[in-house]
Regions:
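Solvent-exposed, non-transmembrane regions of integral membrane proteins
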Residues: 1-558
Length: 558
């Protein structure tokens, strides 16, 4: 097992094997080969995949696949599907080109852009903490945390956030708080800073507020949480809210114990075996930690999006001749704010990419960030021809960031699992999230059409136009995921819930292409209602699978 330098996080699983080729006398031969994650060994039509290994790491488990013809045939099918989808988009006689040239939509730019896509002092309630100058200098010191070299500010911020639910505590910086715990734990253990949101657990612990100290959770040598535990982690048994709160509180206590034992944060080894971060990366991570990009942007985008949506409905209910110069100035203001929001989100996403050293698409938090970025980009591209994409961009990006915030998706930057280190994964996730963003636009487009009936036909044409790249992005993302699965595990399809629901989504939206066979889709009202209802399959694919069905693709808690 190869590890990331200075950490215990696996970077790759590698097996060294010797192949014996049977023969007679001098004709027999052998050779040494290597198998690892996403690196297949092919020998005489057999493909060997790294699967697992023994606990003592003395033996390796390999998956063997023999399908000499199937891979070529399958890949040719994927290529033909991709060529046909591109052909539909660029065919001069195709429906997509006809929709682009429709008089109701021909009012602005070209939609081909769719494809671009310690010294101690006493402060605050006599708590012993570092002075602010020492704390600030400590913030940029490099340590190993969660199997990654980071500035000290990162574990300090995560520690305070995990315990209190906030980025700071009692007016103290995260470095001051964690410094106090490291230097004077006998004082800080009496400080009520462990946030417990479950009222029943607070009552059982005799707490007057929603915050407990470490001493509140111990009665001498007895750990009080054990008295309330009912075994909610038994297989097949769902935990009650009280048991979930006990587990969450226990994790917070464990975090404090890990800090005191020295296992939560480790200094860089002095032998130089771990390469420190560059000064630019340290500064970038400090900026990323100190600016709450997601929290600021979801509140801002939802607020501005609602204002822009109400303004859009107000203008839509009036005739063009009645629209004032003030309305046009307000529209230009919303557009300027849209570009600013996009650049702010791009800055946050780019910083995360630069700090992590990889494209941020490995967990639920990062994919929602990418979806928010995609919706803002699409709104910027379409806003000249379709002004209503401006409020849509604000609202969709705001909801995406809100879901990431409320769902408590893990915002920590961690090394990638070996199986995720693949360019196929990045393309797979990027295409699918682009399709989800377009489907979300179509859903809001349907809602707007129900509010402003007289624009129903034009909005239906727009949704039909977006349907082509949206469903094609989803289809391309599905078969790129199949290629990635074949490279990693030796199979294209495993009937995992996420795979099945992605296929269901692809088929549900695919029905809307068949206007001749299904004449109901020619009626704007039916079409818009169908697009709104179809978006439920997207929600099920992304959120329902993560939180309800589970499976290999589930990263609700990632």
């Amino acid at each position: 097992v190869e590890y990331y330098p200075g950490t215990e996080a696996p970077a790759d699983y590698i097996s060294h094997i010797r192949i014996l080729r049977p023969g007679q006398g001098a004709d027999s031969s052998s050779c040494s080969r290597t198998v690892s994650m996403n690196r297949i060994l092919s020998e005489q039509g057999f493909r060997f995949y790294q699967s697992s290994f023994d606990e003592d790491k003395q033996g390796s488990w390999l998956t063997v696949n023999h399908d000499p013809w199937g891979i070529g045939i399958t890949y040719v099918g994927y290529i033909l599907l991709g060529i046909s989808m591109i052909g539909i988009l660029f065919s001069r006689k195709g429906e997509f080109r006809r929709l682009m040239n429709h008089p109701l939509l021909k009012k602005g730019g070209v939609l081909c852009l769719l494809l671009l896509a310690g010294n101690m002092q006493v402060q605050g309630r006599t708590l012993p903490v570092l002075n602010i100058r020492q704390a600030d200098s400590l913030a940029s010191e490099q340590v190993i945390y969660h199997d990654r070299v980071v500035p000290f500010n990162t574990p300090a911020r995560d520690f305070v956030m995990k315990l209190t639910g906030r980025a700071s505590y009692a007016g103290l910086t995260p470095e001051q708080v964690i410094g106090g715990w490291l230097l004077r734990p006998e004082v800080w253990r009496y400080e009520p800073m462990i946030y417990i949101k479950n009222r029943e657990l607070c009552r059982l612990l005799n707490l007057k507020t929603s915050y407990a100290s470490v001493t509140d959770l111990f009665d001498g040598q007895r750990y009080r949480l054990q008295d309330f535990w009912q075994g909610g982690r038994e297989t097949g048994r769902k935990m009650s809210p009280l048991e979930k709160a006990i587990v969450e509180t226990d994790e917070k206590v464990g975090l404090i114990l890990m800090l005191q034992k020295g296992t939560l944060i480790r200094p860089l080894p002095k032998d130089g075996s771990v390469k420190p971060l560059s000064l630019s990366k340290v500064r970038a991570e400090l900026i990323y930690n100190r600016i709450p990009f997601s929290k600021c942007l979801f509140m801002f985008n939802l607020t501005v999006g609602l204002l822009a949506f109400f303004h859009l409905v107000y203008c839509g209910l009036r005739h063009s001749s009645e629209r004032s110069a003030l309305s046009r100035r307000i529209n230009r203001l919303f557009v300027a704010v849209l570009y600013a929001a996009f650049l702010f989100q791009l800055l946050g996403y780019g910083l995360r990419w630069y700090v992590g050293g990889r494209i941020p698409l490995s967990n639920g938090y990062e994919t929602m960030q990418f979806m928010a970025l995609c919706t803002l980009l699409l709104a910027c591209l379409f806003r000249r021809r379709f002004p209503f994409t401006v409020p849509f961009g604000f609202l969709l990006s705001g909801f995406a960031l809100l879901v990431a915030h409320l769902g408590q998706m893990n915002p920590q930057i961690t090394p990638l699992m070996p199986v995720l280190v693949s360019p196929w994964l990045s393309m797979h996730v990027s295409l699918i999230m682009m399709s989800y963003a377009l489907f979300a636009f179509m859903m809001l487009n349907g809602i707007l059409a129900l509010c402003i009936r007289r624009h129903g036909k034009m909005l239906m044409l727009l949704s039909r136009l977006l349907l082509y790249p949206a469903n094609f992005f989803l289809g391309a993302g599905i078969f790129m995921g199949a290629v990635w699965a074949n490279v990693s595990w030796g199979r294209y399809w495993a009937w995992d819930p996420k795979e099945v629901w992605a296929l269901i989504t692809f088929l549900v939206y695919g029905m809307a292409f068949h206007l001749k066979s299904l004449p109901a889709f020619r009626r704007p009202l039916f079409f818009h209602i169908y697009m709104i209802a179809a978006f439920l399959t997207v929600l099920m694919t992304y959120f329902g699978v993560n939180y309800i069905l589970g499976g290999m693709h589930s990263y609700a808690n990632a």
